[in-house]
């Protein structure tokens, strides 16, 4: 059962990515390095609540 999650930039707070994750298999928060259009560079994006 995959749920939609929102990824938020840790530096500017922009929420520009949507992803899916199985919360039963991976209960910890997801962190990915992705491109931030506001910062115009790759930054760390974390799963929001």
Swiss-Prot record:
Domain of life the protein comes from: Bacteria
Record keywords, A-Z: Ribonucleoprotein, Ribosomal protein
Entry keyword Ribosomal protein: yes
Biological process terms in GO annotation: translation
Pfam families per the UniProt record, alphabetical: Ribosomal_L33
Cellular component GO terms, alphabetical: cytoplasm; ribonucleoprotein complex; ribosome
The keyword DNA damage is annotated on this UniProt entry: no
Entries under InterPro entries matching the protein: Ribosomal_bL33, Ribosomal_bL33_CS, Ribosomal_bL33_sf, Ribosomal_zn-bd
GO function terms (MF aspect): structural constituent of ribosome
Family: Belongs to the bacterial ribosomal protein bL33 family.
Protein name: Large ribosomal subunit protein bL33
């Amino acid at each position: 059962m995959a749920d939609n999650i929102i990824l938020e930039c840790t530096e500017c707070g922009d929420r520009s990515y949507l992803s899916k994750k199985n919360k039963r298999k991976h209960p910890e928060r997801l962190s990915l390095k992705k491109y931030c259009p506001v910062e115009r560079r790759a930054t760390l994006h974390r799963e929001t609540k």
